[in-house]
């Protein structure tokens, strides 16, 4: 069974608090694909269905219609029990918005090794990997015996992320992974996600409200609105579509905000696929010659 191929959500739906006065349709018969080895960012306003959608990917919740297909494994609608749930959750690691609240062991070593050991990995082998995982998330290797509760919020988040990476799955699903971090923490995490994708060939699925991060890291952007996918494209295709951004009430990245202002002054760089300040400076210099 191969979980590394495309993840397909086929005509999926999900309703919270069904048959109560608080009933809310979070997903409404929508479909999409997360491609192998790609970085996909999911954007949309609060309540658009982003977080619900990513929880379908590893069976945390089950669709009410259609099916979830992970590689060559299908999870039909309304199924009561997923047969391959342990392997599915090993291969697709879901990192919640504040993963540091998931820490519970008395040492960092035990916390990071908990997932692999729980899924059947030899305990000694799992513990042996911990120093290298700490190094990967930019924490000192000698932290292994420390309590996670002695760490700062940002450090706890690094430990929690190391615990997900320890399971060595092919996919990381990240729900607002840099929320609440300082600028250096944000930069470190985005650098790590880029490295995990490029060097370790991990598929990254990231829900975020930070459009600057989307512009930097995404191969593809999925736009959610009122429980449906309303657009899919490259960062260039999405952020150069001002009508779309207005509809979903999302401001473009700062670089695109600057380019929109320049367009109003008669300098149009929006037809260029610009992703960095260096590319922007180069294209602007050509226009001003």
Swiss-Prot record:
Record-annotated disulphide pairs: none
Protein's cellular compartments: Cell membrane
Presence of keyword Membrane: yes
Entry keyword annotation includes Transmembrane: no
Membrane topology: Peripheral membrane protein
GO cellular component terms, A-Z: ATP-binding cassette (ABC) transporter complex
UniProtKB keywords: ATP-binding, Cell membrane, Membrane, Nucleotide-binding, Translocase, Transport
Gene Ontology terms for molecular function: ATP binding; ATP hydrolysis activity; ATPase-coupled transmembrane transporter activity
Family matches, as CDD domains: ABC_cobalt_CbiO_domain1 (cd03225)
E.C. numbers: 7.-.-.-
Top-level division of the source organism's lineage: Bacteria
One Pfam family here: ABC_tran
InterPro entries linked: AAA+_ATPase, ABC_transporter-like_ATP-bd, ABC_transporter-like_CS, ABC_transpr_CbiO/EcfA_su, ECF_ABC_transporter_ATP-bd, EcfA2, P-loop_NTPase
Residues holding ATP: 44-51
Domain ABC transporter, first and last residues per copy: 7-251
Biological role: ATP-binding (A) component of a common energy-coupling factor (ECF) ABC-transporter complex. Unlike classic ABC transporters this ECF transporter provides the energy necessary to transport a number of different substrates.
Subunit structure, interactors included: Forms a stable energy-coupling factor (ECF) transporter complex composed of 2 membrane-embedded substrate-binding proteins (S component), 2 ATP-binding proteins (A component) and 2 transmembrane proteins (T component).
Stated family: Belongs to the ABC transporter superfamily. Energy-coupling factor EcfA family.
PANTHER family per the UniProt record, alphabetical: ENERGY-COUPLING FACTOR TRANSPORTER ATP-BINDING PROTEIN ECFA2, HEAVY METAL TRANSPORTER
Listed name of the protein: Energy-coupling factor transporter ATP-binding protein EcfA2
Gene: ecfA2
């Amino acid at each position: 069974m191969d979980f590394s191929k495309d993840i397909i959500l086929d005509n999926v739906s999900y309703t919270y608090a069904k048959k109560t006065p608080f009933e809310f349709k979070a997903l409404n018969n929508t479909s999409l694909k997360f491609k192998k080895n790609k970085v996909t960012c999911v954007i949309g306003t609060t309540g658009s269905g982003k977080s619900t959608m990513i929880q379908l990917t590893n069976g945390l919740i089950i669709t009410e219609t259609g099916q979830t297909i992970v590689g060559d494994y299908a999870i039909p609608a309304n199924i009561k029990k997923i047969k391959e749930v342990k392997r599915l959750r090993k291969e697709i690691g879901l990192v919640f918005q504040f993963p540091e609240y998931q820490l519970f062991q008395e040492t960092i070593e035990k916390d990071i090794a908990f997932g692999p050991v729980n899924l059947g990995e030899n305990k000694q082998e799992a513990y042996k990997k911990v120093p290298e995982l700490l190094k990967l998330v930019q924490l000192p290797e000698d932290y292994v015996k420390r309590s996670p509760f002695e760490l700062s919020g940002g450090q706890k988040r690094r430990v929690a992320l190391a615990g997900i990476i320890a399971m060595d799955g092919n996919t990381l699903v990240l729900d607002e992974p840099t929320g609440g971090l300082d600028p250096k923490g944000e930069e470190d995490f985005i650098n790590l996600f880029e490295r995990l994708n490029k060097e370790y060939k991990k598929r990254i699925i990231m829900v975020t409200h930070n459009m600057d991060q989307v512009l930097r890291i995404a191969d593809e952007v999925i736009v959610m609105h009122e429980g449906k996918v309303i657009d899919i494209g490259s960062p260039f295709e999405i952020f150069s579509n001002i009508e779309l951004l207005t509809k979903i009430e999302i401001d473009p990245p700062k670089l695109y905000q600057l380019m929109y202002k320049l367009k109003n002054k008669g300098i149009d760089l929006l037809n260029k696929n610009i992703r960095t300040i260096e590319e922007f400076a180069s294209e602007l210099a050509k226009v001003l010659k």
